[in-house]
Amino acid sequence: MFMKSNAVPSSYVTLRPRYIPYWPLWLGLAACVVAMVWSSFIVPVIPDFACLSTIGLDGLALAMAVMVMPRHFVIGFLASLLPFMISWRVAAIHGSVPGMATSTVAFMIYLMLYVDCMVHDRAAGWNDHLQWQTATIRIYFGFDMVGHFAEKLFAGVHSFHHMEQVFVGFGFPPDGQAVIAGGLCELSVAIGVGMGVLTRLAGIGGALYYLIANHYGRHFGDGFTWNNAPVGGWEYPMLMIVAFASFAIAGAGKFSIDGWLIAHGWMPRFLLPLCVSDACTHVQRDARRSA
């Protein structure tokens, strides 16, 4: 362990918003739940199990925001943001205007909380500024996978069967197993990279997944530029591969599940190489201050 688990890591004291309260997000997420109920049962545009996905995921996001975020901002923020993003994506797939509108407002509140937290932490020094740069890029690239796995796993029967036919075009059998496997891989990358859970392992996994997926997508045979005919070149796939692989170098940084667990001394030692290349700088600094 890097430090005693009952100590409060000093670098995490400032990792919370200073000016933006939590209650606007609670109201925003509650409005999202109401909007998803409306679009599922009152004016039903969200079909079959997708209605359970949107309502349940927004409910989970609200629970994390209310019960966890005020006490442990990093954990609560990341654990709330991912299910919210999935629900937002499913609402957009099915054209739920109330769902998209309320989700847009809620997302702006998430963004304000994140920026407020970053500004609150600004006195930490240039190294921590780089940590915020890394965190922003990591969260974006990790949660970019939401747009891919949501339509495979959470958007309903019609969306699943559509993706099943897409995978048939890639040469897979029409049994849906490849759709489920691909969706679970993408969900794992979103959790691992976006939330920062075993980030080095997730970065390697994400890079390998994109390498394999885009082999089947035949992008590597269409040149470099993404808008090349017929399916687009390898510009975008290579961007994703390099981005994911880069997180295998040093891990996620402090605004992550890995960073939080390591700083509190709760990450098992045998998992540390899958999270960070060495003791994080903010963990080393906290250890010196607590000595």
Regions found by a protein language model. Name each.
Residues 2-154, 176, 180, 198-291:
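Extended, low-polarity transmembrane helix blocks
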Residues 149, 190-191:
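Glycine- and acidic-residue-biased ligand/ion/polar-headgroup-sensing regions
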Residues 153-178:
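Membrane-interface interhelical connector segments
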Residues 163-170, 181-184, 208, 261:
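Hydrophobic alpha-helical segments of integral membrane proteins
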